[in-house]
């Protein structure tokens, strides 16, 4: 991809900026997005030679066609009524038990659903809390539409599920049987490994240590954490539970350092980092912030830095996680990465550098926080 961009004689960040406007024009369909995209394309043809502009437009059109295809597939999935549910495969690392309420993500007929069930007994609750295997439930249930936004600035649960590739919820009325299964899908393996680790930590470590471990290592915050979130916020440590590029860099650098000290060639280590990154992303639930950090780290090892690195990261994410900018978490993660890529305070004294970086990030992210949460 980078070689194609170099042939266009355009900076990658400029193409990425146009792609962001095209992305929101396709997915949001707002007048502002169309207007911004039109202005940028007009400037493209006015600034660069016609042939280069045409080549850039062809390159951008490939992404736009991909966006349109994904949007149409999503719209078809929303319109199409699913058949009646008789069984559902449980993704074990998504299991959440809150009182007598059970929720998880499940797969049936090749589609992903958010599943809800009212637990009937204490033994059933304990069984699901300790469940770590891949299972299929024989059920009686019905599909429903997720709740939309009910008030101004309220949470739009339906839009959130749509951004996760989920277009219906499944309400289970009765579980008839539970059957363990095996799978050849690596994503299922990662789900099982992650679930086993989460259950082990919660069974063997006290609170709040277990919260730290599941949050920092696996990106999972359970219902017990929600009850303590106000306390953590008042102590000023709530941010410690969010996986960030710092943790990703720590694990990747550690993995790389160990292999190099074992005498492996640098080329071999670079190749092994790809499957390691995939496994690590799976163990953290493929969160946008982790995947974005991993992609940036891998590109940095290929010599791409700062804005070129950020631009190529966006383009890769557009392909592997097309919905990443449809959530507040995705927007915030990329905004932080952009601000860090833009900052250059190396010539300042240490204290002034720290203050300048903190102020730049805080002010830069403020409009996004106000837009999504009406607070900061």
Language-model segment annotations:
Residues 1-79, 169, 292, 317:
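N-terminal leader/targeting segments
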Residues 29-34, 39, 45-58, 170, ...:
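Hydrophobic alpha-helical transmembrane segments in multi-pass membrane proteins
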Residues 2-4, 63-239:
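Membrane-interface helix/helix-cap signal primarily in integral membrane proteins
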Residues 16, 27, 59-60, 97, ...:
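Short linear sequence motifs
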Residues 21-22, 216, 329:
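A residue-level signal for conserved active-site and pocket-lining positions in enzyme catalytic cores
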């Amino acid at each position: 991809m980078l070689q194609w961009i170099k042939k266009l004689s355009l900076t990658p960040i400029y193409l990425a900026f146009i792609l962001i406007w095209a992305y929101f024009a396709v997915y949001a369909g707002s007048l502002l997005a169309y207007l911004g995209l039109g202005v940028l394309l007009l400037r493209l043809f006015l600034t660069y030679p016609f042939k280069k502009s045409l080549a850039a437009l062809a390159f951008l059109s490939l992404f736009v066609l991909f966006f349109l295809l994904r949007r149409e597939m999503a719209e078809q999935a929303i319109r199409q009524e699913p058949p009646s549910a008789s069984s559902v495969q449980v993704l074990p690392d998504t299991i959440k038990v809150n009182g007598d309420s059970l929720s998880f993500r499940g797969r049936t007929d090749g589609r992903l659903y958010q599943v809800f069930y009212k637990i009937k007994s204490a033994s059933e609750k304990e069984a699901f809390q300790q469940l770590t295997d891949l299972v299929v439930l024989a059920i009686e249930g019905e599909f429903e539409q997720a709740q939309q936004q009910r008030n101004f600035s309220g949470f739009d649960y339906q839009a959130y599920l749509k951004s996760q590739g989920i277009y219906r919820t499944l309400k289970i009325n009765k579980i008839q049987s539970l059957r363990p299964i095996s799978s050849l899908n690596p994503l299922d393996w990662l789900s099982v490994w992650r679930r086993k680790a989460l259950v082990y930590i919660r069974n063997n470590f006290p609170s709040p240590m277990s919260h730290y471990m599941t949050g920092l290592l696996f990106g999972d915050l359970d219902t017990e954490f929600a009850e303590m979130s106000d306390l953590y916020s008042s102590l000023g440590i709530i941010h410690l539970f969010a996986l960030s590029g710092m943790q990703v860099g720590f694990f990747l650098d550690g993995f790389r350092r160990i292999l190099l000290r074992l005498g492996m060639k640098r080329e071999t280590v670079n190749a092994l980092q790809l499957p390691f990154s995939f496994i690590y992303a799976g163990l953290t639930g493929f969160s946008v912030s982790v995947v974005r950090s991993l992609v940036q780290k891998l590109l940095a090892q290929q010599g791409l830095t700062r804005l070129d690195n950020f631009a190529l990261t966006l383009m890769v994410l557009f392909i592997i996680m097309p919905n990443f900018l449809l959530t507040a978490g995705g927007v915030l993660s990329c905004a932080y990465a952009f601000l860090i890529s833009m900052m250059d305070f190396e010539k300042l004294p240490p204290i002034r550098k720290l203050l300048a970086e903190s102020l730049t990030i805080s002010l830069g992210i403020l409009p996004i926080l106000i837009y999504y949460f009406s607070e900061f």
